[in-house]
């Protein structure tokens, strides 16, 4: 009497900050509190995105100019790396990043996952990845509405097609706009395997279910720590 009873998925979610994919049922995704967002939530998030991206571009412009010069000095090729990514509801957009790999890094191999100690990465690129400064041009993607500041990281369409066949509920992560940074990025180490993708999906589903301005601010603060202490990839 007076004791709250929770099912296992709910208890696991609260204890770990992620949703256990192996225990999910389609009905739970439909009826569980949190997955259906109101128009008010979407408007607030968009205002947050536009404000933060606008201020970020203005403040980061001198740093972005220095990064562009460093990339040009070290290696030939374009400063920006532009690549198709799967966005909200599977719509493909062009993602902008500072180039961190040598030019034509995938020539002869086709699309492959980045590795932790990737031999294709330049010295400047390695620093940019550790500090996540390579993501700064994506502020423009946020302003254009392709991305949100906070959300699941966008994957390449080729990887999405492959992963959705191997991981249950993988496409649920496309129900919101992808982000420059996200819950999975601040809670989980870098990984490039199917097992890593499952783990990151569990964090992404938690974010989607519990999406709020407070959670976005929490992720943003954690991301700032990653940038300051170079704890990225």
Write out the residue ranges for each language-model feature.
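N-terminal hydrophobic signal-anchor/signal peptide
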Residues: 1-61
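Hydrophobic alpha-helical segments characteristic of transmembrane helices
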Residues: 2, 8-9, 137-140, 184-187, ...
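Proline-centered helix-kink/hinge sites
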Residues: 9, 62, 78, 137, ...
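Short, glycine-rich, amphipathic interfacial segments at transmembrane boundaries or analogous
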Residues: 12-13, 18-20, 81-123, 181-200
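A hydrophobic, helix-centered structural microdomain
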Residues: 40-105, 141, 213, 218-233
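A short, structured surface patch at a secondary-structure boundary
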Residues: 114-177, 219-227
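Short, conserved catalytic or interaction motifs in soluble domains
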Residues: 152, 188, 210
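Short beta-strand/loop motif that positions the catalytic acidic residue
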Residues: 205
């Amino acid at each position: 009497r007076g004791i709250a009873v929770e099912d296992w998925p709910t208890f696991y979610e609260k204890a770990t900050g992620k949703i256990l994919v192996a225990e999910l049922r389609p009905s739970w995704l439909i009826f569980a509190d949190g997955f259906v967002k109101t128009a008010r939530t979407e408007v607030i998030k968009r205002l947050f995105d536009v404000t933060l991206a606008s201020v970020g571009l203005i403040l980061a412009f001198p740093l972005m100019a220095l990064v562009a010069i460093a990339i040009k000095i070290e290696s030939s090729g374009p400063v920006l790396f532009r690549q198709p990514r799967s966005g909200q509801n599977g719509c493909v957009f062009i993602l902008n990043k500072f180039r961190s790999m040598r030019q034509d890094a995938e020539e002869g191999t086709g699309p492959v996952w980045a590795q932790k100690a990737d031999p294709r990465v330049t010295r400047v690129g390695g620093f940019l990845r550790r500090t996540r400064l390579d993501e700064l041009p994506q502020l423009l993607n946020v302003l254009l509405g392709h991305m949100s500041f906070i959300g699941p990281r966008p994957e390449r369409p080729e990887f999405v097609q492959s992963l959705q066949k191997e991981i249950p509920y993988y496409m649920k992560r496309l129900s919101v706009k992808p982000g420059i940074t996200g819950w999975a990025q601040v809670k989980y180490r870098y990984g490039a395997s199917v097992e890593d993708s499952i783990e990151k999906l569990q964090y992404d589903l938690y974010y989607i279910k519990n999406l709020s301005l407070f959670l976005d601010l929490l992720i943003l603060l954690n991301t700032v720590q990653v940038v300051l202490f170079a704890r990225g990839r």
